Amino acid sequence: MTGPAIFDRLAIVMAHPDDEVLWAGSALRAAGKIILVYGELPGAPELTAGRKAAMAAFPLQTLDWLEMVETGVFDSASWPSPRETEYGVYPHPALRVFDSFDPDRYRRQFHQLRDLLRVRLSGMRNVIAHGPWGEYGHEDHIQVFRAVASLADELGFRLWVPGYRAPKTAVLMQRHLRFLGRPCEALPIDHALAAQIAQIYKDTRT
């Protein structure tokens, strides 16, 4: 093995197309697998079509796009102190933002996602995923973290998460700080690759 230890048998698991370049840009070329979860956003056909075009143009062959349907629960948790659940955070009906709000699908898809990831993460030594507070507080990010974290002991990989937080996620981050280990060393970003991927998302308006 050459390079940092985090690159050894590394998988990246992120919720949406573009999250990989935002939260794991320094590890994209080193990863053996880049797993992106969501595809269609009901009620947003242009975004859905744009994502399909972006994924078709993605420059790395390690991409594995699951194309699960988004559940429209963004910003529906009781921030800044959401109720945590096995499957993520509780999406409150009174706080719905999108017409596609589907908390039942959000609950169901957790188990489907775990099953899909169990196969894909088998044999991995390191996994980069979203943090338990979802960076800026995205309910989809938190669900992806929960699914990945629930498999870490079973499959024997080490889980790494971004340290970024927004003001609204400070409380949730504080709840989880005691579970975090030592940080990874700062790693350089492949600026040319990041710019290439970012341009794809700009061109497809995703």
Segments the model singles out, each with a brief description of its role:
Residues T2-V13, A30-A31, P91-T206:
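Metal-dependent de-N-acetylase/amidase catalytic core
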Residues M1-S122, E154:
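Active-site rim/loop-helix segments in enzyme catalytic domains that contact anionic ligands
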